[in-house]
């Protein structure tokens, strides 16, 4: 069912000149725990991966966790989700909603919760939300190379802690 929905998404919403999301072809491969997509700017991965994963989340009930480096970037993910729905029009944007909690933001479409947004500094607190997080097993951490002062301390360990809270 996953491959069928992914193929449908790619055919209808993914222009040929952009990143063709080959990593998603292997998303259900039990031999692979995580994927890295390292490409130049402008190939569409920062729009097309989130878009396709939100689409699949809605249609297949596979939740997505968007992780950002700093709390202030959570708003950018909210804006990206709205932009995706307005641009591709695969769902009525007026049915999009957000619910804030202390540690994450829930993204919903209609009656479904399809994703959450959190930041790396919530890694320790998120372990107390593992009952919720387990429903959002696909983690998207789309970050660019930053100036040395923009990185947070223990960045890798914090991402690993979030992964462990989800992968129970």
PLM feature segments, named:
Residues 33-106:
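Conserved P-loop
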Residues 13-17, 46, 152-156:
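A conditional alpha-helix N-cap/helix-loop micro-motif detector
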Residues 24-27, 55, 128-130:
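Short, flexible, glycine/charge-rich loop motifs used to bind or transfer phosphoryl groups or to couple energy/partner
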Residues 27, 56-57, 162, 166:
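Hydrophobic helix-cap positions at the C-terminus of alpha-helices
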Residues 4-31:
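Pre-Walker A adenine-sensing motif
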Residues 102-156:
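Conserved RecA-like ASCE ATPase "motif II neighborhood" in helicase/translocase motors
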Residues 152-168:
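Substrate-engagement module of ASCE P-loop NTPases
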């Amino acid at each position: 069912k996953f491959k069928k929905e992914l193929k449908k998404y790619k055919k209808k919403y993914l222009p040929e000149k952009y990143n063709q999301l080959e990593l998603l072809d292997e998303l259900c491969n039990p031999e692979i725990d995580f994927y890295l997509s390292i490409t130049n700017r402008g190939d569409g991965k920062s729009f097309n991966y989130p878009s396709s994963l939100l689409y699949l989340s809605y249609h297949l009930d596979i939740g997505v966790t968007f992780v950002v480096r700093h709390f202030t970037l959570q708003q950018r993910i909210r804006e990206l989700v709205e932009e995706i729905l307005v641009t591709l029009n695969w769902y009525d944007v007026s049915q999009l909603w957000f619910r804030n909690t202390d540690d994450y933001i829930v993204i919903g479409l209609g009656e479904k919760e399809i994703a959450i947004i959190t930041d790396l500094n919530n890694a320790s607190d998120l372990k107390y939300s593992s009952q919720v997080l387990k429903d959002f097993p696909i983690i998207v951490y789309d970050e660019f190379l930053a100036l040395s002062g923009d990185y947070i301390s223990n960045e890798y360990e914090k991402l690993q802690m979030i992964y462990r809270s989800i992968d129970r």
